């Protein structure tokens, strides 16, 4: 199944690149997004670009996907578990009320669910993770085709991993807050004489705080006996290298704008003598809409 998803994604990407090479003239695409019409409640029609820079407009994107997950949590097991990951992702973007049209407000929310098994197939992981991030990007338009942006996000995350094999300490919980550096590049092109785009966004955690028990410390000790010293850790790229890459292609299909995406979500930590990683690679499909407040 994963092979079919990868093959479909590569075919779609090849078609979009071929269409962009065949039609360099973007007469139907406005040079700057401020020229886009602002008198519509739903601007998902052919005359509008996938840009958040229209005043009073909010861009909303929903993506659903599946892929692979590699999970390690030495609090539960020294083995790395592999399995299937499912994701629902929502992304929003709009022009900020300040910044003279150069600043956009961005939000990204995701829910992961994974089912993984050990190399010996005698243990299973049930894993879930939620992330919510929001912040600002400063935007540049060096050419009519490109939009570049850089900024920062505040990200909150939480989740758990449950090991079906363990009788003592069968689960591990997670909770964290981090400041992230964020950047994106967006390329606009014509797809059969209609506006389309390719987009890449990278977010990386710079510093934050995270809950993690110490090695050998049980949840009974923490919450029943009150032995909670040292469970809150300061995080940085040295002990918690975490990054996310989201790439997508937005294509016009009749009156809709179909979105094909790939997400690489890498979360790692070494806190309190315990190691954890969650490496997720998912391929997604969904839609993008722009709503304009009249």
Task: Locate predicted features.
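Outer-envelope beta-barrel architecture signal
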Residues: 56-62, 99-107, 144-152, 192-200, ...
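Residues on the lipid-exposed face of transmembrane beta-strands in outer-membrane beta-barrel proteins
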Residues: 88-98, 132-138, 152, 181-187, ...
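Residues that define the transmembrane beta-barrel architecture of outer-membrane proteins
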Residues: 60, 82-88, 124-132, 146, ...
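Extracellular loop and loop/strand-boundary signature of outer-membrane beta-barrel proteins
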Residues: 73-81, 116-124, 166-173, 231-235, ...
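Outer-membrane beta-barrel transmembrane domain signature
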Residues: 168-255
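Transmembrane beta-strands of outer-membrane beta-barrel pores
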Residues: 66-74, 109-117, 154-162, 187-189, ...
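Short glycine/proline- and aromatic-enriched beta-strand/turn motifs that initiate or cap beta-hairpins
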Residues: 22-106, 292
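Gram-negative (and chloroplast) outer-membrane scaffold detector with strong preference
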Residues: 101-162, 173-192
């Amino acid at each position: 199944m994963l092979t079919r998803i990868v093959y479909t994604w590569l075919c779609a990407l090849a078609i979009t690149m071929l269409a962009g090479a065949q039609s360099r003239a973007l007469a139907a695409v406005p040079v700057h997004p401020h020229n886009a019409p602002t008198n519509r409640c739903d601007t998902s029609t052919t005359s509008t670009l996938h840009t958040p820079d229209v005043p009073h407009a909010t861009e909303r994107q929903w993506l659903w996907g599946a892929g692979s997950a590699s999970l390690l949590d030495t609090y539960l097991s020294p083995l790395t578990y592999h399995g299937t990951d499912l994701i629902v992702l929502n992304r929003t973007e709009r022009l900020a009320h300040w910044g003279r049209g150069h600043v956009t407000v961005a939000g990204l929310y995701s829910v992961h669910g994974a089912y993984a098994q050990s190399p010996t197939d005698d243990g299973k992981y049930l894993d879930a993770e939620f992330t919510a991030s929001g912040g600002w990007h400063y935007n540049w338009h060096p050419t009519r085709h490109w939009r570049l942006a850089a900024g920062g996000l505040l990200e909150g995350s939480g989740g758990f991993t449950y090991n079906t094999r363990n009788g003592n300490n069968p689960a591990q919980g997670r909770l964290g807050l981090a400041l992230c550096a964020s950047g994106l590049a967006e390329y606009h092109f014509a797809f059969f004489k209609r506006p389309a785009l390719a987009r890449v966004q990278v977010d990386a955690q710079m510093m934050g705080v995270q809950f993690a028990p110490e090695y050998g410390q049980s949840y009974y000790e923490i919450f029943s006996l009150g032995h909670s010293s040292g469970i809150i850790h300061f995080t940085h790229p040295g002990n918690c290298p975490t990054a996310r890459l989201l790439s997508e292609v937005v294509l016009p299909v009749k009156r809709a704008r179909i979105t094909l995406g790939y997400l690489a979500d890498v979360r790692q930590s070494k806190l309190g003598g315990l190691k954890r990683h969650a490496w997720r690679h998912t391929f997604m499909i969904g839609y993008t809409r722009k709503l304009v407040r009249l």
